[in-house]
């Protein structure tokens, strides 16, 4: 597996220092405000919730392992940093690693991936926009399937050409309006495993996924060119 403290240290330029916890001797960042030491028994479960989650809807009550805290340590006047559910910080922590994974998986089936964006409107979880440079018209559908494989919770994905900025919702909508035709570019995947956070899914997360090919046909590129002007 990946040791998360090593990743954090790399992101911090190797400047983090670590100490060993008094009770268990496990490493922790030396500048921590609060340190909790305890045990997590996977067989001891308790109901958690309901509370609102990433999608700003109430999540189902779930049975989760119980943490038994044995010692608590803190600095004088410690600061407790709280991440608000559904807020931008929560969305970045959840979505950013998935964007990287989607880019990796799509890159395995399409020669050139230009951009991947999990949209804020989809909670940076359910909706993605992927920009590719097609070599053949089937590349867009392969990109959709790869995106769904990379991020199983993904519900809808739109594939666009490199001239469409994935982070600009107006441009993405324009691509759907002018380049998408449902009889040739719509992919429906019924009975797929999705996100249990999605209130429209079944209790086990089963849902129907949708892919939209908003790229233009390669042999008709001239017809679909966007005029570059500023009003």
Residue ranges and their predicted role:
Residues 1-231:
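Charged, compositionally biased interaction regions
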């Amino acid at each position: 597996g990946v040791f998360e403290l090593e990743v954090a240290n790399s992101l911090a330029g190797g400047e983090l220092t670590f100490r060993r916890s008094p009770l268990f001797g496990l490493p922790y960042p030396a500048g921590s405000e609060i340190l909790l030491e305890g045990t997590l028994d996977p067989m001891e479960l308790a109901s958690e919730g309901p509370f609102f989650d990433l999608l700003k809807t109430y999540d189902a009550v779930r049975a989760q392992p119980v943490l038994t805290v044995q010692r608590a340590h803190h600095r004088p006047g410690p600061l407790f940093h709280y991440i608000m559910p559904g807020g931008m910080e929560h969305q970045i922590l959840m979505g950013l690693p998935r964007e990287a994974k989607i880019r990796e998986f799509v890159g395995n089936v399409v020669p050139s991936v230009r951009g991947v964006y999990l949209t804020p409107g989809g909670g940076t979880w359910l909706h993605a926009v992927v920009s590719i440079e097609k070599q053949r018209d089937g590349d867009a559908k392969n990109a959709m399937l790869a995106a769904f494989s990379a991020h199983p919770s993904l519900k809808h994905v739109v594939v666009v050409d490199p001239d469409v900025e994935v982070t600009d919702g107006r441009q993405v909508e324009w691509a759907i309006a002018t380049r998408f035709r449902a009889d040739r570019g719509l992919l429906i995947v019924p009975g797929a495993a999705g996100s249990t956070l999605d209130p429209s899914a079944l209790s086990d997360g089963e849902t129907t996924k949708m892919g939209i090919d908003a790229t233009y046909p390669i042999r008709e590129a001239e017809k679909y060119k966007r005029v570059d002007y500023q009003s």
